[in-house]
C-alpha cells in the first residue's frame, strides 16, 4: 500500500477490520481511512465523502429490523498529519520561482542585447555562440540555486516543512533549471523586444505553471483537455517529483518517470534552442 501511495496510483485506501461482516451486526466493525495528506484540502474532501459513503453503506447492509451503531471511520493521514498547507505549496513555489528566474530573465537578458545593439558587437567578435549562451545563462543558473537554497531554508526553519527523503531532489532541480534555461533561450530567438519576451514568458510559462502544473489545483480534477496540456509543462513533472521526494520521502526509483520526462525535455529544448540561437547569430 505504501508503494502504491508513493507511485501516485492511489490517494486513499480503506482498511477493514477482521471479520468485518460478522462484527457489522454487533456494531463492532471498524474501518480505517488511509489518506495522502500532501494536499490537505483534497484529503479533507475525500475523507468526508468516504465517511458518508461508508456510513450509508453500513446501514444498507443490515437486514430489516436490525439496528447497529453507525460506522465512524478512523482517519490516518500520511506525509502531512498536521494538515499544513505549506506541505502542498512549497514544491509549487519552488517550481514557479525557478521557471520565472531561468526562463523569463534569461530571455529578457538576451533580447536586451539585441535592442541595445551590443549583439552585433558579439557577432563580429571571435567568441563562439556557445560561450555567448553560457555567459547569459550561468548567472541565472547560480541565482536559481541561491533562491532554491533560500526557499528550502525558509521551508524547514520557518514553515516547519521537513525534508523527508533523500537529496536527490537537488538533481531533479538541476534538471529543471536546465529545462527552464533552454525555454528562456528559445523565447529569445522568437522575440525582438524585452516587452514581447516578458509577455511570451508570462503567457506561455507563468500562467500555465500556476494553473495547470498541480501547484494550486489537483491535476486529477481538471478536464481531460487541460490534463493533456499540463503533460507538456516541465513544472508539472518537477513539482510532482519534488513532492514525492521531499514530502513523501519515497525511494528514488519511484520518481524515475518524472526524471525521464524532464531529461527528455531538457535534451530536446537545449538542442532546438541552441540551433535556433546559432542560426539567428549567423
Give the location of each predicted region:
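Extracytoplasmic loops/domains of multi-pass membrane proteins
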Residues: 1-59
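Transmembrane helix boundary and interhelical loop/hinge segments in multi-pass membrane proteins
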Residues: 8, 104-125, 137, 282
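A cross-kingdom feature of multi-pass membrane systems that activates on extracytoplasmic/periplasmic
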Residues: 59-83
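Membrane-interfacial helix-loop-helix junctions in multi-pass membrane proteins
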Residues: 79-83, 213-269, 281
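Long, hydrophobic alpha-helical segments
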Residues: 86, 90-106
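Short helix-capping/hinge motifs at transmembrane helix termini and TM-loop junctions
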Residues: 107, 111-112, 125, 155-163, ...
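Alpha-helical transmembrane segments and their short interhelical loops
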Residues: 129-201, 207-210, 253-259, 263, ...
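Short cytosolic juxtamembrane segments of multi-pass membrane proteins
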Residues: 275-282
Amino acid at each position: 500500500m505504501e508503494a502504491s501511495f508513493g507511485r501516485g496510483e492511489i490517494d486513499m485506501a480503506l482498511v477493514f477490520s477482521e471479520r468485518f461482516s460478522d462484527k457489522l451486526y454487533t456494531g463492532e466493525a471498524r474501518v480505517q481511512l488511509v489518506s495522502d495528506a500532501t494536499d490537505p484540502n483534497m484529503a479533507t474532501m475525500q475523507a468526508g465523502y468516504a465517511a458518508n459513503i461508508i456510513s450509508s453503506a453500513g446501514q444498507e447492509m443490515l437486514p430489516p429490523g436490525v439496528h447497529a451503531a453507525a460506522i465512524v471511520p478512523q482517519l490516518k493521514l500520511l506525509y502531512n498529519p498536521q494538515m499544513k498547507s505549506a506541505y502542498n505549496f512549497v514544491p509549487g513555489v519552488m517550481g514557479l520561482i525557478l521557471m520565472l528566474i531561468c526562463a523569463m530573465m534569461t530571455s529578457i537578458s538576451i533580447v536586451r542585447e539585441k535592442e541595445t545593439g551590443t549583439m552585433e558587437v558579439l557577432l563580429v567578435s571571435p567568441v563562439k555562440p556557445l560561450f555567448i549562451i553560457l555567459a547569459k545563462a550561468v548567472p541565472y543558473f547560480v541565482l536559481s540555486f541561491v533562491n532554491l537554497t533560500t526557499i528550502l531554508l525558509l521551508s524547514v526553519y520557518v514553515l516547519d516543512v521537513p525534508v523527508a527523503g533523500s537529496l536527490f531532489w537537488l538533481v531533479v532541480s538541476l534538471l529543471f533549471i536546465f529545462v527552464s534555461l533552454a525555454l528562456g533561450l528559445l523565447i529569445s530567438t522568437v522575440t525582438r523586444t524585452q516587452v514581447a519576451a516578458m509577455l511570451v514568458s508570462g503567457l506561455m510559462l507563468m500562467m500555465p505553471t500556476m494553473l495547470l502544473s498541480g501547484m494550486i489545483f489537483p491535476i486529477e480534477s481538471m478536464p481531460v483537455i487541460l490534463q493533456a496540456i499540463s503533460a507538456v509543462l516541465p513544472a508539472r513533472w518537477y513539482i510532482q517529483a519534488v513532492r514525492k521526494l521531499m514530502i513523501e520521502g519515497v525511494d528514488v526509483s519511484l520518481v524515475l518517470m518524472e526524471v525521464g520526462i524532464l531529461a527528455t525535455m531538457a535534451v530536446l529544448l537545449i538542442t532546438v534552442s541552441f540551433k535556433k540561437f546559432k542560426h539567428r547569430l549567423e
